């Protein structure tokens, strides 16, 4: 986090020291998600401008992040009602969120992971709603009160789906894989629901169910296209235009390198029956 703040103010930092910068005068880089660096850096700048204190800026950031995290958790619990989960279960989950110290501490961390987790939680909830659209569900509370069951996926849920997908894309390096997987799965379920609705209608000579929108899967793919286009523009146009250096490719290779080093350090060779062997100097022989 300290490196991100220094990057935003164009001060030397640990990440810019080892990267081959596109412009030596621009120290902002993609080692950390650039969007998150901009968010926390802007809050610090606001604190300096208004209160003449960087700590005040961090308080602003922490307050906003804590509020967003609490709202996302509350929304996830609220969505359980639309999915037919009973009040006792929702109450237990809400109490767990409220009194488990881990969540309150986690919500105040100055790392990219918190806002990413918030965005991913919203994306996950919306994906589950889309997948459950064609399934029969129970709403005991509405039935007892004589009310109409709530709409599982309303118009505002499209906005939340887009925000969750974009947040997952830009708040973690390589985060595009999350909306890619979520939208593809959700679109497949939506298309399957339409197919089954028409199939049942053909068997019974009835009209297809109105509760299963015909073109919802196209909306999901449109959200995915928005994420792909936004990510392509940001990485291929915006960052080069502002001389923002991408993160090192060594990050992608860190896990294979770590596991290889661990294997060489702790094991004398591969399992029996496997051709390759590891020599004392660490080279792999076939």
Predicted features and spans:
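Membrane-helix interface segments
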Residues: 54-55, 83-91, 153-158
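Juxtamembrane membrane-water interface segments immediately following transmembrane helices
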Residues: 1-12, 216-286
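Membrane-interface transmembrane helices that cradle and orient dolichyl/undecaprenyl
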Residues: 123-157, 188-196
């Amino acid at each position: 986090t300290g490196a991100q703040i220094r990057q935003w103010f164009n001060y030397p930092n640990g990440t810019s020291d080892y990267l081959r910068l596109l412009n030596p005068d621009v120290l902002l880089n993609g080692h950390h998600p650039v969007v998150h660096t901009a968010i926390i850096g802007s809050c610090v700048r606001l604190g300096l401008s208004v209160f003449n204190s960087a700590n005040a800026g961090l308080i602003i950031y922490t307050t906003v992040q804590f509020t967003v995290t609490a709202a996302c958790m509350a929304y996830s619990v609220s969505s359980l009602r639309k999915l037919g989960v009973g009040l006792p279960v929702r109450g237990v989950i809400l109490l767990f969120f409220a009194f488990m110290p881990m969540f309150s501490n986690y919500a105040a961390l100055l790392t990219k992971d918190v806002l990413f987790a918030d965005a991913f939680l919203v994306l996950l909830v919306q994906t589950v709603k889309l997948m459950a659209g064609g399934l029969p569900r129970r709403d005991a509370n509405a039935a007892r009160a004589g009310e109409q069951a709530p709409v599982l996926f309303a118009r505002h849920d499209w906005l939340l789906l887009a925000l969750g997908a974009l947040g997952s894309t830009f708040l973690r390096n390589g985060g595009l894989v999350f909306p890619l997987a979520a939208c593809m799965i959700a679109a497949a379920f939506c298309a399957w629901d339409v197919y089954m609705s028409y199939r049942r209608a053909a068997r019974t000579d009835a009209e297809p169910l109105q509760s299963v929108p015909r073109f919802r899967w196209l909306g999901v793919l449109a959200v995915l296209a928005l994420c792909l286009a936004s990510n392509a523009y940001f990485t291929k146009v915006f960052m080069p235009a502002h001389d923002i250096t991408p993160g090192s490719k060594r990050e992608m290779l860190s896990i294979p390198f770590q596991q290889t080093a661990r294997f060489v350090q702790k094991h004398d060779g591969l399992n029996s029956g496997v051709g390759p062997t590891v020599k004392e100097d660490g080279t792999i022989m076939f």
